[in-house]
Amino acid sequence: MRFLDGHQPRFDLTYKDVFIVPHRSDVASRFDVDLSTYDGSGTTIPVVVANMTTVAGQRMAETVARRGGLVILPQDLPIATVQQAVEFVKSRDLVIDTPVLLTPNDSVSDATTLIHKRAHGVAVVAFEGRPIGLVRESSCLGVDRFTRVRDVATTDFVTAPVGTDPRKIFDLLEHAPIDVAVLTNADGTLAGVLTRTGAIRAGIYTPATDARGRLRIGAAVGINGDVAGKAQSLAEAGVDVLVVDTAHGYQVKTLEAIKCVASLNLGVPLVAGNVVSAEGTRELLNAGATIVKVGVGPGAMCTTRMMTGVGRPQFSAVLECASAARKLNRHVWADGGVRHPRDVALALAAGASNVMIGSWFAGTYESPGDLMRDRHDQPYKESYGMASKRAVVARTVADSSFDRARKALFDEGISTSRMGLDPDHGGVEDLIDHITSGVRSTCTYVGASTLAELHEKAVVGVQSAAGFAEGHPLPSGW
């Protein structure tokens, strides 16, 4: 990457401050762009879901990995919970989705609670493991909530044997009353579901898989307590990427934790952070990290900069840290501060190999929280920062009440936030489509067919606030 006309900014820059200049291109189509990353994480799109309690869970991990990304489970989860999540994700199919499952005797109330755990919008009613009907939310309207789902389920739905080509599934669903096909095993038992859009995505995305062809998943460990023991347990549970995570990565305690984990030779990429300087990047890499997380304070739920004055504008931080890592043949992840697909593209242009996304994905069906509605009946999910009082209380549950109360005084994050869902595009896959479409287009404008070429060829300019505002669409006129 280079700056336009050799310009050297006199101050640090955020994503809003910069733009990418179009270049002569021989990349004819967005589908000619390879979004696979090159940092050993195994991602085939440059998207990593941040280790936030309100974002990263097993449903999110399954869905994102199927599209080529990676989810990092939070450090606060008990080892047993992580083990369960890893086993679940690695047992999932690479093409078809896990269904929301009901029995004939479940109630309409059960159905309305569970349907929105997945973006495909239906629940499968199964008896003795065999699908007998589908329930949509519309089927439950105007019905007593104690009504049995067998009385509202439709039996008019498409079925196909597992292994059916996704293109054929797409064709079967073209005139179907419900846009979901139910896939069955040879014995007639339920295998999963696939929508028309899912069938299309199966031909666009390449799942992020391990050496045994199973979906990938990562997990985080903090710098307190038995770091080595937990890291060892996470590796034994089968995680594919391990993250040593703390808000201030450039401290002695973090360096000691990295050295401790690196000495275990666990055989998985070791990510560590967070830092915002070349010096901090070098120290973490020299301690044993293979990838460094960059970002202090850019996240939507983070109040660190306003509380402490500490941090750095994210684009400049990524640019400097990526340059330092490259000299050691290592990599960085840009963590936080992305609000639009352009921000992801700019982080990649600056040299990040992956971009971590948190709050943006909190408002999706696949995030762990329950779907709620505001007084205007708009759907939303709650989110909070991982250094907030709410997160601190959850993290210190084993401490004495006095210690918990004392630690709760020192929070740096939003404890309650509402992340709205778009009812028509509420799935994380919709956001992944949105992001990767933007990044692919960026590559065609730059003349890059890979992410490495994007960084190599990108020419970045600095703009005014008015320049950034000019780029916003005006759907309602002016």
Swiss-Prot record:
One of its GO terms (biological process) is purine ribonucleoside salvage. Gene3D superfamilies: Aldolase class I (3.20.20.70). It comes from the Bacteria. InterPro entries: Aldolase_TIM, CBS_dom, CBS_dom_sf, GMP_reductase, GUAB1, IMP_DH, IMP_DH_GMPRt. Its cofactor is a monovalent cation. SMART domains: IMPDH. Residues 95-152, 153-211 form the CBS domain. Involved in the purine-salvage pathway. Catalyzes the NADPH-dependent conversion of GMP to IMP. This is GMP reductase. It comes from Mycobacterium leprae (strain TN).
